[in-house]
Amino acid sequence: PIIVSFEVSTNRWFAKGTKVNDFELANTIKLANSENSINGTKRINGETWSTQTREVTIFPQKAGTFTLPEVNIEISVNTEHDGIVEGSIKTQQQNFTVTLPKALANIEHFIVSPMVELNVTSNAITHKDYAIGDAVSIEIEVISQQSPAMMIPPLEHPIINGISIYQKTPKIFDTSNRGQLVGKRIESIT
């Protein structure tokens, strides 16, 4: 993922949270509610300034050059003489490039994650002869760290002559583990 940080600062203090207005970026997925908020301070020319940083996580869907558009940011500052002053500022366009590692050049489906876990459970009995009409259920769970569930591609099930496959609607959901996004996709077939 790409994390875009928007930082604003004042030599006073903020009256309320800074808001980064929504923006579109073609061929990317920007998660709803992915905006993280960080309040802090820093020293500028010997003075302490208050800062508010907003981070937005973006998942590019292909390699190439992207142009982050101008983004409108709404701020509210407590001033010394004029009370609360509200306004907005715009960022400048920024370009960034996404490249696909050579190892993935000919791979159609992959998961971008530092850690992927695969769990398979089944009611199949090893070394059993199955008869016509017997059913075996399999549940496949894919868990990806730091990647939303929507980025886990659907599993492909081969067509086998004489065998019917019935697939339930996949369960797809995201959770957070100590502030880290965890995506999970569960597919059940019989």
What are these regions (language model features)?
Residues 1-190:
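Surface-exposed interaction/ligand-binding surfaces
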